[in-house]
Amino acid sequence: MRKLKSLVCGSKFGQFYIDAISKMKECVEFIGIFSNGSERSRLCAEKYNVNLYTSIDKIPEDIDIVFIAVRTGVMGGDGSELALKFLSKGIHVFIEQPIHIDEMKKCVKCSIEKGVFFHVANFYKYMDTVHKYIECSKGLLRKNEILSIECACANQVIYSLLDNILRIFREKARFSIENFWIQNQDFFIASGSINDIPLSIKVYNSVNTVDSDSYCYYLQQINIYTSEGMLFMVDVNGPIIWKPQFRAAHDLFIKKGDELDQRIFDSKMYWYESESELSYKDIFCKKWIDAIKKEIKEFIDNIYFEKMTEYRRKIQSEIVIPSIWGLITQK
């Protein structure tokens, strides 16, 4: 199969995409960076030995994929506008979250008309910890009654959190957000339900004016309460904790072992670490890059194997994410 000619728009978070696709030479031909010509962009182009484009008219017509890592329209950028321009030319688009529901609908409509793929990124679900948590949660759904879901996240990743929750329910989710509480200037809580299961999301809403991407207490936490215990993901890099329900041993010292409720002895806490002991440097340079590569590879496989029917089905279920994201963030 031929290599797909690829362009990255943006060099801030775009650096992660640049590094990831530069390590995918078996399927990607990295041809350049499109940006406003910042010093960072120039240095990136030099390091990876690719062209730097500052005018969209100068970009070659024969590119296959554009990775857009600049703010979308709803966030004050031109990412959504760029996506539509490239999609209208028959170019596949892979764009960073978040995106407004109206912007997404336009992009999806254009992609289907042109027979190309449009994807809103969420590399977190490809990290070892998040992937493990989603799979364990699916198992809980099959075997236990889910009583409640409590989440917490930074404002910047509400969109990705909603996508991760959607994966737990195998893309068959009915979201509802009904109530909001402002705790103080830094935190608010949105509550509602998913498939009639109570859902709450605590959002850290404080943004540092110097560096809006930093100084978060956490990126994403998810805590699922079931009839047998709770499954807690402390953050996207772990750990994951399974804590069974507490059961009192009222007759522990007066009855024989086989006369006691065996669940008292069988129940124990499990702790899954994987990435939680790594430094942030290791997480950024290794785990994030690996996760981005996995997501890009899946996107490229859709292109190679022309999975357009599957794409149309999945993208319709994903439209719920910007809809609920909009409800939460407009408050």
What residue spans do the PLM features occupy?
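Rossmann-like dinucleotide-binding domain that binds NAD(P)(H)
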Residues: 144-228, 236-237
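C-terminal glycine/acidic-rich active-site capping loop/insertion
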Residues: 230-311
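Short hydrophobic segments within beta-strands
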Residues: 7-9, 34, 69, 121, ...
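Short glycine-rich anion-binding loops that position phosphate/pyrophosphate groups of nucleotides
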Residues: 71-73, 123, 206
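A contiguous active-site-proximal alpha/beta segment in oxidoreductase catalytic domains
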Residues: 100-164, 316
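Beta-loop-alpha module in the N-terminal Rossmann-like domain of NAD(P)-dependent dehydrogenases
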Residues: 17, 48-110
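C-terminal helix-rich "cap/oligomerization" subdomain common to oxidoreductases
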Residues: 3, 8, 45-47, 65-70, ...
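N-terminal Rossmann-like dinucleotide-binding module
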Residues: 1-48
